[in-house]
Amino acid sequence: MIREFKSNPLNYNDIVFLGNSITESGKDWSKRLNYPNIKNRGIGGDVTDGVLARLDEIIYFKPKAIFLLIGINDLWNNNSPDNPSAEYIANNIIKISQVINAQTPKTKIYIQTVLPIEKEKFKNNILKVNEIIKANEKDNPYQTIDLYSIFVNENGLIKKELSTDGIHLNEKGYDTWVDFIKPVVSSIN
């Protein structure tokens, strides 16, 4: 991933897609959304603490906007008492927006809700993270984009037709995501 970042460096006023493997696997977001100033900064396996640790290299370029999708790996790794709670994860996501805003207040920040996955045991914590993010939007420098609602089926799990493995998206999933956020991206550019 670092090689790709070096071959496609950030520039001032870019739009940045920031997150984990779900964002990373979207590959060339500039082609998907038809805007040359969009850069992918998704890293497979990344967690909220990881994004916080690498924010400086993104903030330095004062992005026009940042679209953040992060949190599922924090939950996925939550198999021991040492791993973070839904509250910790949501608060880290909110903290990411606050750090961005403190250093580059003109950057528009869009927090995309954590997507559902096929594992039932994560359903309640995903909902809890998303609820905290939505409930705190008015007091923080971000807007919420509710991706969860377009990916969830009637059982509270990811729609099978949008996923390759119950977590990651297939092309139809990426097309669904792009169609949903395109009006927001167009309003920025």
What kind of region is each of these model predictions?
Residues 1-65:
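Serine-esterase "nucleophile elbow" of acetyl-processing enzymes
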Residues 15-17, 39-42, 65-70, 108-113, ...:
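Structural recognition of the beta-strand scaffold that forms the well-ordered cores
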Residues 42-46, 67-81, 94, 114, ...:
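Cell-envelope and extracellular/periplasmic
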Residues 50-61, 84, 91-99:
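Alpha-helical scaffolding within the catalytic cores
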Residues 69-75, 98-128:
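Active-site segments of SGNH/GDSL-like serine hydrolases
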Residues 87-112, 134-142, 146:
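Charged, glycine-enriched surface loops/patches
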Residues 116-189:
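Catalytic His-Asp segment of secreted/periplasmic serine-dependent ester chemistry enzymes
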